[in-house]
Amino acid sequence: MPRFITELKRTHSCGELTKADIGKEVVLFGWVNNRRDHGGAVFIDLRDRAGLTQVVFEEDVRPDVHELAGQLRLEYCVGVRGKVVSRGGNVNPKLRTGEIEVHASDLEIFNRSEPAPFQIEDEIDTGEEKRLQYRYLDLRRAPLQRTLMTRAKVNHLTRNYFTDKGFLELETPFMVKYTPGGARNFLVPSRLNPGKFYALAESPQLFKQLYMMAGFDRYFQIVRCFRDEDLRLDRQPEFTQIDVEMSFVEQNDVFDVMEGLVVKLWKEVLGIEIPRPFQRMPFEESMAKYGNDKPDLRFDMPHVVLTDLVRQHDGGGVPLMHEAVKAKGIVKAMRVPASANFSRTEIDKLEEYVKGMGAKGLARAKVGEGGEWTQSPLAKTITPALRQAINEACEAKPGDLLLFQFGKESVVHTVMANLRVHLAKRMGLIPEYGSGGAWRFLWVVNPPLFEYDEESGQWAAAHHAFTRPHDSDLQFLESDPGKVNCYRYDLVLNGFEIGGGSIRLHDPEVQARVFKAMGITDEEARSKFGFLLDALKMGAPPHGGIALGMDRLVMLLTGAESLRDVVAWPKTQKGTDLMTGAPGDVDARQLRELYVKSTYEPK
C-alpha cells in the first residue's frame, strides 16, 4: 500500500488553494499535467478533476525529493506534501490557484504512465475513434470532466427536487416481455425457458402506469432505456431519461411540475432565470409555421402555407403549384429578410441542399421595389393577382428573398423545416452548436393520436396507444381516426425535443376502442397487454406523465456538440464500443446453453 495513502490523507483538491491558504502544509494527489526542469528546481502542474496546482521541487530544500521529481513524466500518478507559498509577481490569471504554488517537501509516485496516445489537454486534434478507444484517458481532459460533473449535479438536483415534492424514486424492470411494433428491441435469450426471449425495456411506460394503479401516486426514476435503432448525432442505443408519472392530474399539472424542475436546473447549473409559464403551441400550428413539432424559436422566419391561396387563384399561372394542390399536396413559402443579394452560387448551394432531402428543386423569387419578382422562373408565368397575394401573405418587402416548396406534405414540411434552420446558421442568427445565450422553451400540444401507415393500410398510434384522446374527438374513433387529437405534449428547447409525455387512458372501454381503430383485435390486445387491460378494470386512477432525455438535457446545458460528449462510455454510430470491443463473439458452448444459433455468414 502506498505510504501516502496509509500515513497521509489528502487535505485539498488541486483546484481550491488560494492566497488564504498561504503558509499551510497540504497534501495533494493527482496526475502530472505539465513538467518543466529548470536544473535546481523541477516544476509540475498537478491535476485532478477540480483543477491544477503548480508544485515546485527545489534541490537545495530536499535533494532526495528533487531527484525523485526528476523522474516524473506526463500522466504519472503521484502524491505531494508541501507548503503553500505566494507566487508573488508570477501570478497565473488563467488558473483559480494562480496566486499560489506548493513547495514540496515529500513526493510519492503511485504509478508511472507510458506515453499517452494523445495529449491530455482541453483542445486536441485527435480523431474521435482514437479518443473513444482510449476513453479513460479522454475523460481526464477538463472539458469532459466538467461535463460529467454537470451531469452528476443534474442528477443530484433532480432527485432532490422530486423527493421534496413527495415523489417516490421507484425501479422498473429492465428485462420485459417483447411486443412487436414500435422501436426495435434488444433481445435477451432465456436459458431457463428455451426458445423464449426477454426484451430490454425501451422505456418504463407500462410499469410506471401500473405503479399508479397500485396506488403509488407520484413516481420518478432516472432510468436507463434501450433501443436497437440506427444511430444519429443525438441518439445512443442505451440512454438515460428522467421518468415521471402522477395520478389525479391533467396536463397543466404535469407542465407545472416539469417547468419547476427545468427552472431549477437552469438556475442552479447556469445561473440563468427562465421565465414561466413556458409558451404553448398547438401541433397543427407548429407544423404549418415551422414544418415540424420541435421548432427553434430563437429566430423568426416562419413558413407560410399558400395552398388555399393557390387553390383560390386556380394555380395563378404556376402549373407545378396547381398540380401539387390538385394532388392534395401543399404549397409553402418562407421569407428570408433582406436577402435578395444572395448570389446565384449561394442559391445553387441551397438547391443542392434541399435536393439531398428529396426535394425536386428550390423555387425562389427576389422581391423588387414595386413588389415585382426578379431572377425567378415563377415570375414569367405567375399572375399579378397571385403574386400580390403571396407577397401580402408573406409580408414581403423589397430586398427580401422568397423560397418555395410544393408537393407531398411530408416532404415539403421536412425540407422547409431543415432549410429554415440551415439558413439561420448560415446567416448567423443561431450558432452551429450551443444556445448562443438564448433559451426558448415550448410545449407543443394537442397532436393527432393516430398517423396513417400507407404500407399496412392501417391507422397506427403516433406515439403509443395509451394516450387519452380529447373527449370532443371520441366521436371520430370509429368513423375518422385522423381527426382524433390527444392529450400528448412535447417539451422543446431551441429545436430539440427534450421530453415528451401524455395524459394516459384509464378507461378500459375507450382503450378497447383505440385498439380497434388501430386494427388490433381483442385477442391481439390481450396477448400483448392483457396485464394492463386487467389493471385498467381494477379502479385505475386518472394519471399522466412525461420523460425528459437526460443525455440531451445535459448536452444543451453544456453546449456539447453531440450526445457522445455527455455520455461517459458512448457507442459509435455503428453501436460499437471501441474501447472494450463490444459487441463481441460468444463461445459456442454458451450459445448451445441458450438454444441460440447464428445464421450470419460474413461476406
Curated annotation (Swiss-Prot):
CDD domains, sorted: AspRS_core, EcAspRS_like_N
Alphabetical keyword list: Aminoacyl-tRNA synthetase, ATP-binding, Cytoplasm, Ligase, Nucleotide-binding, Protein biosynthesis
Gene Ontology terms for molecular function: aspartate-tRNA ligase activity; aspartate-tRNA(Asn) ligase activity; ATP binding; nucleic acid binding
Compartment(s): Cytoplasm
Keyword ATP-binding: yes
Broad EC category: ligase
GO terms for cellular component: cytoplasm
Highest taxon listed in the record's lineage: Bacteria
GO biological process per UniProt: aspartyl-tRNA aminoacylation
Protein's name in the database: Aspartate--tRNA(Asp/Asn) ligase
